[in-house]
Regions:
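Conserved N-terminal beta-strand and adjoining loop/helix that marks the start
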Residues: 1-16, 37
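Conserved Nudix-box catalytic region and its N-terminal flanking loop in Nudix hydrolases
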Residues: 15-54
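Short secondary-structure junctions
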Residues: 55-62
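NUDIX/MutT-family hydrolases
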Residues: 84, 93-124
Length: 129
């Protein structure tokens, strides 16, 4: 079974919003781009709007799909979709994360990201997205 997950790439002043998974979350302590699982009968853009409202309490304008790939862990596979967030209303607050930061892409290697985010990070660091 493959689980579909949609993530949002939120950029402000050359920094990207990343969150550290809270202690009650699966894979707690790992950093990630905010997002979540696609629900039945939901479009990918509807999903990222819902997830960012639930996780960060912001309303977003969803831009283009910037990356899509499949990533498998030993016990589960994910199909990941990452959308650029063109604009947002509100100030992001950590609801499911225990910490949010605005990080420069050249600092990404300092953070312990979810392994599934690493293909996207590699693209970002090589200016491919």
């Amino acid at each position: 079974m493959v689980i579909k997950v949609v993530g949002g790439i939120i950029k402000k002043e050359n920094r990207y919003l990343i969150g550290r998974r809270g202690p009650k979350e699966k894979m707690a302590g790992f950093w990630e781009f905010p997002g979540g699982k696609l629900e039945e009968n939901e479009s990918k853009k509807e999903c990222i709007k819902r997830e960012l409202k639930e996780e960060l309490d912001i309303v977003v304008v969803v831009g283009e799909l910037i990356s899509e790939y499949q990533y498998s862990y030993s016990d589960i596979s994910y199909h990941l979709y990452f959308y650029r967030i063109d604009d947002f209303i509100g100030e992001p607050i950590p609801i499911v994360h225990d910490r949010l930061i605005w990080a420069k892409s050249n600092d990404f290697k300092k953070y312990n990201f979810l392994p599934g985010d690493n293909p996207l990070i590699d693209l970002m660091l090589n200016n491919k997205v």
